[in-house]
């Protein structure tokens, strides 16, 4: 039986520290063969959207543009001190950190084939380049208290 994992960051009350704990778990869990990490999206009509538009629980909606409401590569609200840019950087850092572990490669090739693996490797390399050009680097965010 293969273990897959999906989790979400950018929920009310989260900090860089709590997100780091989640990412560390995913990064070091050899039982988890695939880990998906989405950024919370406050879709209209949801409780999360209501909280974000009303500024409750440290949330602040920054865009009503529905074309920007994606779970990957986009964020449309502040979560406490976490800006969309920080959430995106954490998501990219996590992807590189999780999928650059060589012990994940063979299961990925078996599951997605060599082309799927190559596409993942390209994304990791692009994300890694982006991380290295960012002065914060991999998981070096200062937590605001």
Would you name each region that the model predicts?
Residues 97-145:
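Membrane-proximal basic amphipathic "stem/tether" segments
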Residues 1-112, 142:
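A structural motif corresponding to the C-terminal lobe/cap of the Radical SAM core domain
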